Amino acid sequence: MKPTLKTSLLKLALVGMLFYASYGLSNHYAASLAYVPEIAFAWERGIPFWAWTIVPYWSLNLMYAAAFFFCRDTREQNRYVARLVSAQIIATTCFMLFPLHFGWPKPPTDGLWGWLFDSLVAFDLPYNQAPSLHIALSIIVGAFYWTRFPKIRLPILLWQSLIALSVLTTYQHHFIDVPTGALLGWLVLWAIPQHGISPFRRPFDTQGRLKTSEASFCEAKTNAVSFARTSEASFREAKTSPATRSREIKIAMLYLAGAALSALPSLFGGAWLWMLWVSVSLSVVAFAYLTGNAAVFQKQADGRLSAAATVLLLPYLVGVRLNMTYWLSGKAKTARVRDDVLIGSISGVAEIQHCGGVFGKKTASAALKMLARCSTLLRFLPCIYHFLPQKSASQAKSPHPLAISDDLPAVLDVCAEYPHPRYRGVYRVLPLLDMVAPSENDLVQAALLLEALRRQHGKVLTCCALGYGRSAAVVLTWLLVYGGCRDLAQATAELKQARPQMVLPPETAKAIEAAAGRLKTSEASFGDANQDS
């Protein structure tokens, strides 16, 4: 229900009071200190003073307030309020813990520009610098309008960019305040996402597994009748094994160590400060493993990561892409296990779609020849690399290589940490963490979903980052339950013929057998119930 005018006015008044009270308090606290440092780069002296940019600078206040009345329902309004308040509290805390000031004099101004600058000086002081609350709020407020008014996204983006530029050209902030403010804004959007639940709110038990499987089960069972064969109660009972939980923590510690090491070069200052972005990125990944929560990556139903997760994780995503390129070099990206069940890397999906499923074989061949001429350069670009042909001996020798003309009606994506390329066919996602054994719940759900997609669409590709681990576990579970394999050894032997590089750690094998056992029991119980009826 759309919030009433009275409710919107009340919330705006309360948030506004918090803003001015906390902002003023931190300003006066910094003013009371004997010494407040200033951080500025020498090149900033070349930044021009553009008096007219005080207009976009001030416009953020209007957009900030107007958004309260554009909210379509109470939930959207409460999310907007939560984002504003979170940014305000975090920024004010930083202002008081690490006070900075802007000491450069502003050139004299008159007319409308001068009046706007005088109005700003009336309540503002040259403190409250890093992180720039203006930058953080421009991202948060801009995200609201971006979602609310999709038809005018380009003007919104341009205006918000002008607002961000204005913090420098009005001599309100030094450059160091801009990336720190952006970090705050994106962190708030990540913590309070537009879709799904905040990664900080997901409840998890002492065994370490968050209830992602139960939530996904409730959603997935509406898409296939076969999901009703597994009781929701059984999903609540199974937990992550202590060995898997221990491995998650070890991986988290490694990423935290990487985050700490990445931050060290920033002590040299200058361009080395950008290494803090790498540190933040690895810290987010560490948080995912520390909580055992694949939802930290915020992979959406269409396979994309949220904008906030993409920005925060960008250095890590580049590393993931390079890692995929290295391990898949000279190897087939996809392979056929059965006529209707395929396995492979998430990067192989784009290759199939753009080279076969969309354009056709002749057009694709011509395109590949053209791309091959500049492949040496393009392979260094992660966003383009997966469109390139992979000519290798191992691919030619693969027992069931996926031909470029093959159709791909359905994709089951179990890769949590990397976005899926835009796909025109049927696509489903069940994000699982890399390098740890999937839970029994996850494998039960994935096998059910794989079978449902196979029955509905005839052919399914199960993919993860490389097509060696998580996707292999899902396909092995399916082979045991629906593929006619008598035991895990037979299923593994069959899968290795198609995907020789697959890996099967002991903990994953245990989870596969447990999941297959539960599914077989459910199938048997379902069959007995049908006979009795």
Predicted regions and their residues:
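Alpha-helical transmembrane segments that form the membrane-embedded catalytic/substrate-binding core
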Residues: 137-138, 173-193, 309
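Cysteine-based protein phosphatase catalytic domain of the PTP/DSP
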Residues: 113-120, 325-381, 385-390, 394-462, ...
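N-terminal transmembrane-helix/juxtamembrane module of multi-pass inner/ER membrane proteins
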Residues: 1-63, 107, 117, 214, ...
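PTP/DSP superfamily signal
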Residues: 196, 208, 241-321, 325, ...
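Hydrophobic, membrane-inserted alpha-helices
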Residues: 61-67, 136-143, 159-166, 255-263
